[in-house]
Amino acid sequence: VISNQEESKYDVPQGVFQIGQGMAAPTLMTWGQPEHHERYLPKLVSGEEIWCQLFSEPAGGSDLAALRTKAEKEGDDWIINGQKIWTSGAHYSDYGILVVRTDPNVAKHKGLSYFFLDMKSPGVEIKPIKQLTGGAGFNEVYFTDVRIPDSQRLGEVGQGWQVALTTLMNERAAIGGGGGGVNVDLAYKI
């Protein structure tokens, strides 16, 4: 909330850091390893790296249990195939937080795993969705044989639902704090 209020004072566009600072950072802090904290958190907090959230899919919308994007283990890596939609800011993000299906043979909520990935990885294709206004804040993101190391997994394999709940709990605070920033901004301008 404080970060959003300060950004608003200096006309930083609303929402640019909400996913990284408000959702990815708390998830990394809760579920990440010390090396994740050292490498990613400083650049998240400083705004040097922008993050997006890769959760919603065309067939299931925001119903995570219905997602179809899959990851298959190959040695020390995972191969990701599938599609996400309505991804805010993917076209300018450096990293993304991603929930995928790693086990199709168990209950839907139990077959999920949670990763983060470099949005410039080979096989990641980002297509902005043009709005009526001409802008494109949302994107479709396609994954074709995207290889990511197991070290970019948060939580255990099959624990993606629990990790995603951490993200979603913080999403409410991040979005709510954005409104507080706007209110502070208006107070300064009045």
Name what the model sees in each region.
Residues 1-48, 88-95, 171, 183:
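Internal helix-loop-helix
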Residues 3-8, 100, 116-122, 144-148, ...:
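Short Ser/Thr-interspersed hydrophobic loop/turn segments at strand-loop and sheet-helix junctions
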Residues 47-55:
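A short, Trp-centered hydrophobic/proline-enriched beta-strand micro-motif
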Residues 59-67:
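Active-site-adjacent elements of ketosynthase-type condensing enzymes
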Residues 60-61, 85-90, 132-133:
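Glycine-rich phosphate/pyrophosphate-binding beta-alpha loops
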Residues 69-72:
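A structural signal for short hydrophobic beta-strand segments in well-ordered beta-sheet cores
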Residues 81-127:
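A short core secondary-structure module
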Residues 123-190:
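Glycine-rich beta->alpha junctions and the first turn(s) of the following alpha-helix
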